[in-house]
């Protein structure tokens, strides 16, 4: 609060000066009006910069709004009067607005503190709290959004085979740092990605470009050999395009940024179990990750992760499923290159027999692989020491370490995981971990494996820095990795005590209830979407066919169709013949219009109902024709019996009358 003495001093000391200023301004305005009448065209005098700044500040703080428009107009040509407004008047106007509650903080003025002028402290605490909370929210949103592209995308979603002749200190400390291009020997990917150029289900000698898409080596060389030109619309000049774009995503790619690919099946990766699904049985393994290590291993292996290192050798079959980066020797890399050459030659024989392929890009592919082999051999002076080092390293691994006696909760992280070879990592939900911790009291006392039923799976979770700070056992995963949380059905777990289940029964029921409500909501939204899509298609077909049926009628037809589908009456398949009424002993027979199936221009079959009046006329016309034909036949028989015989002993036969049919509902006889 401002002291009363200061308020009196401020009001008493500045009252006279303010009145003098107003009088001087009014007199100057009158004089300015009279001078403007005498001299309508007059030159403006150069204004003072200091007075201009004070005048703008005076108008900003509200003093100028209390004056008339006439005074404001007169102040512009004569700025000498503004020099009488001193700093004391500006401070007084600010003080009055603050006391009246009309002062608003706007623009850069908010960064200037005026507390020393008023001798009291403004309440800045609430504003700082709101500012800090908003900044935390913005930072949280920024952390949750992870953009992956290029090497970061490859580092997150795929495993790598790297050259064992190099050390990787940056990757040892931070899993988010991508490995250099020249140190990557193979990128291990799961099967299922087709080559978008030749559309083969399994690319031959697969290669990965910068964006992460996979192509055949020969297809990729053919793509890079095509020269594209760009034409300038203004000048009409065409020039060669300097770069290539990915056929799938449009990212800039080049022949020097291509990585060899190795499929998991070729790498003898066996799936421990299938992808988890709600209601299915899942096998969970207890993983152990010591502090400072980036390699979690199952406790059942009895292998110390610190002895294996963060990047174990690739030919160690028992742990190659769990390592994100593995070291590979030159001999194994040469073996993989030889497999690529054999695959290219086999595919060429097939293409030559079927398509009469010239083999131009096949030769270029083999030459490209030979160049890579030469580069690899040139960098290696002697291959035997490398293989000996790998074999000696394998002898150091012992599968008799008891991890539970060596590590506990204070020295390692213990957690459950399944399907470790997948790009999406599956872990237990926090509530399930809490229940297990209540049962066994320590993470290291958890069972080595659990086989139970999955109740629900939560997807759409991405590893961020905030998530790693919350769950430290996922610190070995790169930022951007997709994870899924599994909810277990604790009603089917035998080792759960009854009292502990009752302790968490409310939370489990609430979680199950939320899952049921979410599923019902999704099913409802799906039905609404399908109904809306069906209505849009029906509206489109009606517009194309020129039918003037209203949208409300289409909704009624759709409702009627749904009622027919949901009824208990068995619906037989529609044939080309007319459909009769449904046979049902419980229901009364109803008269229905006959229907036919008609094939539309889109290749679909639809039921077509004929007009009853037209059908009745057609039926009468057909009956009349049959009756007329019978009469003609009977008349022929009587004529043949009554006619006299001819000279050669045969009776004469009368010629039949003709019946002419026209394409109308009316009969015409001739």
From Swiss-Prot:
Known catalytic reactions: S-ubiquitinyl-[E2 ubiquitin-conjugating enzyme]-L-cysteine + [acceptor protein]-L-lysine = [E2 ubiquitin-conjugating enzyme]-L-cysteine + N(6)-ubiquitinyl-[acceptor protein]-L-lysine
Associated pathway: Protein modification; protein ubiquitination
Localisation: Cytoplasm
Gene: MAG2
GO cellular component terms attached to this protein's record: cytoplasm; cytosolic ribosome
Single annotated GO MF: transcription cis-regulatory region binding
Classification via SUPFAM superfamilies: RING/U-box
Region called Disordered, residue ranges: 1-84, 124-145, 609-670
Zn finger intervals (RING-type): 195-250
Composition bias, Low complexity: 637-649
EC category name: transferase
Protein name: E3 ubiquitin-protein ligase MAG2
Source organism of the structure: Saccharomyces cerevisiae (strain ATCC 204508 / S288c) (Baker's yeast)
Biased segments, Basic and acidic residues type: 51-66, 610-622
CDD domains on file: RING-HC_RNF10 (cd16536)
PROSITE patterns named among the record's database cross-references: ZF_RING_1, ZF_RING_2
EC number: 2.3.2.27
Sequence ranges of Polar residues compositional bias: 20-39
UniProt-listed Gene3D superfamilies: Zinc/RING finger domain, C3HC4 (zinc finger)
Job description of the protein: E3 ubiquitin-protein ligase involved in the degradation of non-functional 18S rRNAs in response to stalled ribosomes. Catalyzes monoubiquitination of RPS3/uS3 in response to stalled ribosomes, initiating a HEL2-dependent response that activates the degradation of non-functional 18S rRNAs.
A Gene Ontology BP annotation from the UniProt entry: protein monoubiquitination
Membrane-spanning intervals of the chain: none
Miscellaneous information on this protein: Present with 922 molecules/cell in log phase SD medium.
The family this protein is said to belong to: Belongs to the RNF10 family.
Main localization category: cytoplasm
Keywords attached to this entry: Cytoplasm, Metal-binding, Transferase, Ubl conjugation pathway, Zinc, Zinc-finger
Superkingdom of the source species: Eukaryota
């Amino acid at each position: 609060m401002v002291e009363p003495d200061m308020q009196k001093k401020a009001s008493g000391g500045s009252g006279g000066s303010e009145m003098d200023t107003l009088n001087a301004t009014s007199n100057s305005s009158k004089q300015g009006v009279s001078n403007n009448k005498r001299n309508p065209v007059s030159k403006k005098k150069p204004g003072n910069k200091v007075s201009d700044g004070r005048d703008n500040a005076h108008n900003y703080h509200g003093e100028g709004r209390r004056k008339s428009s006439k005074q404001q107009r007169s102040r512009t040509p004569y700025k000498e009067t503004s020099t009488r407004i001193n700093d004391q008047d500006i401070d007084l106007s600010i003080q009055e607005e603050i006391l009246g509650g009309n002062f608003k903080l706007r623009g850069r003025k908010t960064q200037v503190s005026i507390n020393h002028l008023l001798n009291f402290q403004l309440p800045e605490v609430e504003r700082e709290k709101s500012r800090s909370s908003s900044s935390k929210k913005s930072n949280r949103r920024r952390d949750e959004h992870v953009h992956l592209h290029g090497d970061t995308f490859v580092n997150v979603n795929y495993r790598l085979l790297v050259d064992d002749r190099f050390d990787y200190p940056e990757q040892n400390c931070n899993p988010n740092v991508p490995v250099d291009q020249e140190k990557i020997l193979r990128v291990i990917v799961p099967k299922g990605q087709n080559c978008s150029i030749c559309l083969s289900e399994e690319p031959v000698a697969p290669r990965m470009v910068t964006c992460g898409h996979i192509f055949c080596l020969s297809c990729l060389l053919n793509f890079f050999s095509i020269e594209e030109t760009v034409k300038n619309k203004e000048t009409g000049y065409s020039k060669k395009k300097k770069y290539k774009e990915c056929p799938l995503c449009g990212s800039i790619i080049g022949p020097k940024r291509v990585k060899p690919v190795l499929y998991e099946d070729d790498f003898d990766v066996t799936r421990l179990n299938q992808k988890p699904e709600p209601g299915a049985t899942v096998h969970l393994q207890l993983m152990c990750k010591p502090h400072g290590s980036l390699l979690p291993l199952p406790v059942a292996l009895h292998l110390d992760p610190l002895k294996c290192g963060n990047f174990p050798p690739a030919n160690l079959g028992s742990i190659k499923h769990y390592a994100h980066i593995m070291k590979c020797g030159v001999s194994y890399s040469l073996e993989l290159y030889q497999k690529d050459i054999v695959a290219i030659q086999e595919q060429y024989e097939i293409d030559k027999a079927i398509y009469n392929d010239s083999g131009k890009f096949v030769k270029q592919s083999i030459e490209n692989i030979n160049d890579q082999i030469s580069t690899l051999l040139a960098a290696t002076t002697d291959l035997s020491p490398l293989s000996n080092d790998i074999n000696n390293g394998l002898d150091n691994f012992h599968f008799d370490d008891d991890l539970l006696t060596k590590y506990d909760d204070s020295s390692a992280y213990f957690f459950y995981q399944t399907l470790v070879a997948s790009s999406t990592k599956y872990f237990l939900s926090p509530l399930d971990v809490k229940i297990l911790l209540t049962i066994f009291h320590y993470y290291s006392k958890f069972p080595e494996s659990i086989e139970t039923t999955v109740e629900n799976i939560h997807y759409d979770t991405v590893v961020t820095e905030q998530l790693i700070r919350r769950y430290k056992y996922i610190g070995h995963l790169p930022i951007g990795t997709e994870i899924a949380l599994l909810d277990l059905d604790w009603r089917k777990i035998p080792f759960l005590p009854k009292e502990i289940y009752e302790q968490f029964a409310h939370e489990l029921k609430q979680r199950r209830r939320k899952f049921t409500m979410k599923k019902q909501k999704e099913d409802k939204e799906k039905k609404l979407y399908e109904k809306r899509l069906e209505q849009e298609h029906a509206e489109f077909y009606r517009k194309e066919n020129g039918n003037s049926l209203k949208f409300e009628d289409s909704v009624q037809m759709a409702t009627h169709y749904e009622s027919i589908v949901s009824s208990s009456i068995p619906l037989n398949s529609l044939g080309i013949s007319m459909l009769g009424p449904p046979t049902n002993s419980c229901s009364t027979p109803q008269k229905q219009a006959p229907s036919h199936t008609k094939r539309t221009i889109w290749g679909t079959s639809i039921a077509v109902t004929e007009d009853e009046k037209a059908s009745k006329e057609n039926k009468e016309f057909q009956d009349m024709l049959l009756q007329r034909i019978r009469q003609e036949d009977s008349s022929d028989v009587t004529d043949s019996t009554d006619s006299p015989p001819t000279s050669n002993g045969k009776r004469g036969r009368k010629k039949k009358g003709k019946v002419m049919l026209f394409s109308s509902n009316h009969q015409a006889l001739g």
